[in-house]
Design a protein with these regions (language model features):
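Glycine- and acidic-residue-biased ligand/ion/polar-headgroup-sensing regions
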Residues: 65-80, 89-115, 215-257
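A short glycine-rich, His/Asp/Glu-containing loop-to-beta-strand
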Residues: 57-88, 182-225
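Conserved metal-binding segment of the jelly-roll/cupin
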Residues: 120-140, 252-273, 280-282
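Hydrophobic, proline/glycine-rich low-complexity stretches
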Residues: 7-86, 90-95, 99-100
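Short, glycine-/Ser/Thr-/acidic-enriched flexible segments
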Residues: 76-77, 108, 133, 234, ...
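Double-stranded beta-helix
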Residues: 142-182, 278-300
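Short active-site-adjacent structural elements
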Residues: 237-238, 249-250, 268-270, 286-289
């Protein structure tokens, strides 16, 4: 029987900006380097910065047209929160044609997927594949709730639900104190780790005294990327650099905020103290090392 997709949304929309709300999910269109270089501080933030991701008893989603990723944050405190379907997806359920990576940066929590419970501790990662129908989130403690960061991409095939702790994520130390970029990289969802259709996901923790991430800078036009910064004290900030390597711009970021990086854009940053960040990619391939260098001395 041929499946009919229910069109539950409006037939015609008058798009007056690059971003709009469709129900409770924000939608953001993709823009190119020529448009981006002319944006002011506010418009840069509107297009690329994702704020207020971690709000108590709230599940927030932002849909980006860069490779159609969905960025999310879930903080269950007083109640269990359920991953909703959304009219924009034109699907029977959220993961009908999608996969989902979940990393917890808070207290211990539980993710229940089609009746199967996963205990997700701090800096553990859970992958849920295409076809997972029911997903819910809960915290073990109200005083120290879980902070679940979500990244979802379209998927064409099913892969099994899999969880990795940070110890299973093949931690690798990179950088040096002399260049203020000593860090530990944890790779969770990638070709040699948790398998997926197109989602690549992991995190980096900066060592004490190190503040520069993703040095040397690079781009990868085969994939877009999202950074989510965490572990940053309230009085500190991240200066996240983006844009064409010859037309760089910056966005000032606080703790628990995400930033969208277009495939053509550099993405690196410097904090006023050390911090951690989750990186996630989607696009043409799953090769973590596939990148085009943009050496520091060539940046403008």
């Amino acid at each position: 029987m041929k499946k009919t997709i229910k069109n539950t949304g409006p037939q015609l929309k008058d798009y007056k900006s690059n971003t709009y709300m469709d129900g409770d999910m924000e939608i953001r269109f993709a823009i190119g380097p020529e448009e981006t270089k002319n944006l002011d501080t506010q418009k840069l933030a509107e297009n690329f910065l994702v704020k207020e991701l971690m709000t108590p008893d709230t599940l927030k989603l932002v849909y980006s047209h860069y490779d159609r990723v969905i960025i999310g944050g879930v903080v269950p405190v007083n109640k269990t929160l359920t991953l909703p379907n959304h009219p924009e997806l034109r699907a029977e359920f959220f993961l009908e044609r999608r996969e989902l990576g979940i990393i917890n940066v808070g207290g211990t929590g539980t993710v229940t997927a089609d009746g199967r419970k996963f205990k997700v501790e701090q800096l553990s990662c859970l992958y849920l594949g295409k076809g997972t129908k029911n997903v819910s989130f809960a915290s073990a403690s109200k005083k120290n709730p879980a902070l679940f960061y979500l990244l979802s991409t379209p998927a064409h095939a099913e892969f099994p639900a899999t969880m990795f702790t940070k110890e299973q994520a093949s931690p690798v130390e990179l950088g040096a104190p002399e260049t203020a970029n000593k860090r530990t990289v944890y790779k969770y969802i990638h070709l040699d780790g948790i398998r997926s259709c197109q989602l690549v996901m992991g995190l980096t923790v900066m060592a004490s005294g190190s503040v520069w991430n993703s040095i040397p800078p690079h781009t990868h036009t085969r994939r877009m990327e999202v950074y989510f910064y965490f572990g940053l004290p309230a009085e500190h900030r991240i200066m996240h650099f983006m844009g064409n390597p010859k037309e760089t711009r910056h966005i000032v970021m606080a703790n628990n905020e995400a930033v969208i990086s277009a495939p053509w854009s550099t993405h690196y940053g410097c904090g006023t103290t050390n911090y951690g960040f989750i990186w996630g990619m989607a696009g043409e391939n799953l090769v973590y090392t596939d990148m085009d260098p943009a050496p520091v001395a060539t940046l403008l």
